[in-house]
């Protein structure tokens, strides 16, 4: 039997009259993301793999050097700004989003140190306003695998809406070495996303196959630190092209 309990401190309307109401109700059964991610980014010295690296993802460097030359870029879940700063240094105009004030503050500090201009926004992807079909490239390192299943379809629609025709989408997310391959139903049965959802290759490709041509799909290369780039092999790295 599905045993769902509302998380403490969450006030909801008792009548569902829209999809937003439905999503808000389902959100309430899981952890509150803003508080969770603010706490996560509070200690910049924490022993988290990507906290120890200032440079970009190794796969992103590969994409930029071999396949894509974007002008306008949208980064989802930018964290401390490693990838946004790298892309800005390559001449891109970057909008970078994160729901954590602590993450955005850290990212802005790094950008100032590097003397780089990035448009950082402390916003949820679902609350961010943009001109449709205005980005050449959308990049997500680590957001999607922390999304509740009921948010995944909206996430996909937003990515598609943001991209220009023939635009590119880059994704880094947990494989099953990085997190458990939790079923969508199990997330709600347990009332927890735990440390995130680990995707098999088949499951991840199924999410995107109808809307994107998958150009590259592999495990990230594990890079020993210190290094100017980040890479861990418990993550998938994929580059896709929007099907118009």
Can you say where each PLM-predicted feature lies in the sequence?
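Class I (Rossmann-like) S-adenosyl-L-methionine-dependent methyltransferase catalytic domain
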Residues: 2-74, 80-130, 147-158, 162, ...
């Amino acid at each position: 039997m599905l045993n769902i309990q509302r998380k403490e401190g969450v006030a909801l309307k008792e009548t569902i009259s829209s999809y937003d109401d439905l999503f808000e109700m389902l959100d309430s059964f899981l952890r509150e993301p803003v508080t969770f991610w603010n706490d996560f980014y509070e200690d910049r010295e924490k022993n988290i793999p990507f906290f120890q690296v200032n440079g970009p993802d190794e796969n992103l460097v590969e994409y930029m050097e071999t396949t894509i030359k974007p002008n306008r870029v949208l980064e989802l879940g930018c964290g401390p700004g490693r990838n946004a700063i790298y892309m800005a240094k390559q001449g891109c105009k970057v909008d970078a989003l994160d729901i954590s004030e602590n993450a955005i503050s850290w990212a802005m500090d790094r950008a100032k140190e590097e003397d780089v201009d990035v448009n950082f926004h402390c916003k949820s992807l679902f609350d961010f306003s943009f001109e449709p079909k205005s980005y050449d490239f959308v990049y997500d390192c680590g957001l999607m695998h922390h999304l509740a299943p009921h948010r995944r379809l909206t996430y996909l629609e937003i990515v598609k809406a943001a991209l220009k025709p023939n635009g590119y989408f880059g994704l880094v997310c947990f494989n099953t070495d990085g997190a458990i391959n939790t079923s969508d139903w199990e997330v709600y049965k347990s009332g927890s996303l735990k440390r995130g959802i680990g995707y098999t290759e088949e499951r991840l490709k199924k999410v995107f196959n109808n809307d994107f041509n998958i150009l590259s799909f592999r495990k990230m290369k594990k890079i020993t630190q210190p290094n100017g780039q980040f890479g861990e092999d418990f993550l998938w790295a994929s580059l896709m092209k929007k099907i118009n």
